[in-house]
Amino acid sequence: ADARPMKIALTIAGSDSGGGAGIQADLKTFQQFGVFGTTVIVALTAQNTVGVRAVEAVPESMVNAQLTALAEDLPPAALKTGMLAEAALVRTVARAIRQNGWGPLVVDPVMVSTSGSRLLTTEAEEVVREDLLPLAALVTPNLDEAAILTGRVVHDAATMERAGASLLRFGAGAALVKGGHLADGEITDVLVTPDGVRRFTRPRIETTPQSISASTWPVSPMIKVLSETIRPLTRPSTRRTSRKRN
């Protein structure tokens, strides 16, 4: 048997009662890639395949307690953020990432629901841009989120490239602008890095958000490029070794 310890990946996001997004989807993905998933839950959502019925933010003190517990005993080798609910929670999360030297960080800036509703206040959107993006090795907005973060109209591959370049100027190491909302028969994702631009195009597949295997099978070339992109962008860790407990 392989005696090597599993690497730890942390997801900081909201809980989705429907299991198709948020913490639940992240943990399924982590398991697919053979890493041990840990969580910091920042919001509770009551939702299903039809829509979101309610959202409630977790108190800042509880979010901070979760972050502290993981820093003491289960520090991540990599982490991602999803919906962070409120400006204060974004600041709390960004502060913990800086203080613990955690990385590489993937920021999925969940700001707009599938029905088009804004999920964050304007203040929270600004804090994501100012506090979280400079910590990110990779930011992965969809078209709506890229438009919010950059203040640009994003509607095709060319504007996706320009938005990605703007996100790098805000401090992100790389930007993957996801074009799943484009109204045509193909999906085009645009990866912008300091070395240039790559486009990934694949046929649109009608599937549910819960169909993880269906949604991930076409992206293996992208995963290879992303891993090669993120590796040199990883910031040196300033994590201190935690004391052993008796």
Predicted regions and their residues:
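Conserved N-terminal subdomain of the carbohydrate kinase-like
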Residues: 3-11, 23, 27-119
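Short pre-catalytic strand/loop immediately N-terminal to key active-site residues, enriched for Gly-Thr
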Residues: 12-18, 198-211
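Glycine-rich beta-alpha junction loops
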Residues: 44-45, 85, 111-113, 145, ...
